[in-house]
Regions:
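An acidic/histidine-cluster motif and surrounding catalytic segment
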Residues: 18, 22-110, 114-285
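Intrinsically disordered, low-complexity regions of eukaryotic proteins
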Residues: 8-11, 203
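Short, positively charged and aromatic/hydrophobic N-terminal segments
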Residues: 3, 10, 17-22
Length: 285
């Protein structure tokens, strides 16, 4: 494959780097703050290495939160989310709306600190494998944790499988949704009272997971997307811009009643002992 490198702007999307017709391929969007030059350089190099076309989606920022809320007809004024969490939340919702408005069959969404696994272009350059299996919602990312998955699996190319996710697996750095799933997710999130809204990964991969009208969420095994802080915890070249908000949320979390705390500890004990037999470690490859 011929690669054309534009020296004047290494951060442009790879649809200008590769001589291919983008419309015939998966629509890949990387959420990134416009002036995050280091992260954008990393993504350009990572996706170019795998010969994958993508577009940067300029992330919502503190300055554009109000405008994004108006465009989405949603209010976050009384939510408990920090400004950073609001911006992240809205960035994902804007992409779902883009998928719906442009009538795209599928979109793949990434955050800008990810690494891609082996043969990634087999999954992010063509969506026939999704259409053929009628998948609507796939988590391509992992936190390298053990998760409860459906026993049955569906084989994918290059020694990967798909299994339905049966318990929360947080993170929004890598997922694929169909237009049908985008509509379902957007309607679900917008139906929530704003004071009950949680960070977007909790809404998608925890709350929505148990929603009776949700599209099934499938986990790719091994996962093909992982963030830098997961794969290289000591490297920290791209620190999270909302990690402070998450830590503050944990510190300010309301203390649970004693009985709830005991029940939680027993649940954790089961998960770490007998529960391990029911779970699968979601590896990265």
């Amino acid at each position: 494959m011929l690669i054309i490198w534009e020296k004047k702007d290494i951060f442009q999307s790879t649809k200008q780097i590769f001589k291919l017709e983008y419309e015939k391929h998966m629509h890949n969007y990387v959420i990134s703050v416009k002036n995050s030059y280091k992260r954008r350089e990393h993504i350009t190099q990572e996706f170019s290495k795998h010969h994958i076309l993508f577009d940067f989606f300029d992330a919502i920022t503190l300055e554009t939160i109000e405008r994004a809320c108006n465009e989405l007809s949603i209010s976050l004024e009384n939510s408990q989310l920090s400004d950073g969490e609001k911006a992240c939340f809205l960035s994902h919702l804007c992409l779902w709306k883009k998928c719906i408005d442009k009538k795209l069959d599928y979109i793949a969404v990434f955050e800008d600190d990810v690494y891609l696994g082996k043969d990634a272009n087999s999954f992010f350059m063509d969506h026939n494998w999704l259409t053929n299996n009628q998948f609507d919602f796939i988590k391509t990312e992992t936190f390298l944790q053990e998760r409860k998955l459906a026993f049955s699996s569906i084989d994918l190319p290059n020694n990967r499988k798909i299994r339905e996710l049966k318990e929360p697996h947080l993170g929004t750095a890598g997922y694929i949704i169909s237009q049908k799933a985008a509509i379902s997710l957007l309607n679900y999130v917008k139906s929530f009272p704003e004071e009950k809204l949680l960070p977007i990964d909790h809404m998608m991969f925890e709350q929505y997971l148990y929603y009776k009208s949700s599209s099934p969420i499938y986990q790719m095994i091994p996962a093909i997307v992982a963030q830098e802080f997961i794969l290289y915890p000591n490297q920290n070249n791209m620190p999270s811009s909302i990690e402070e908000s998450r830590l503050l949320r944990k510190q300010n979390k309301q203390k649970r009643p004693l009985l709830d705390k005991i029940a939680g500890e027993l649940s954790n004990l089961f998960r770490k002992t007998l529960g391990k037999l029911l779970r699968t470690r979601v590896t990265f490859y």
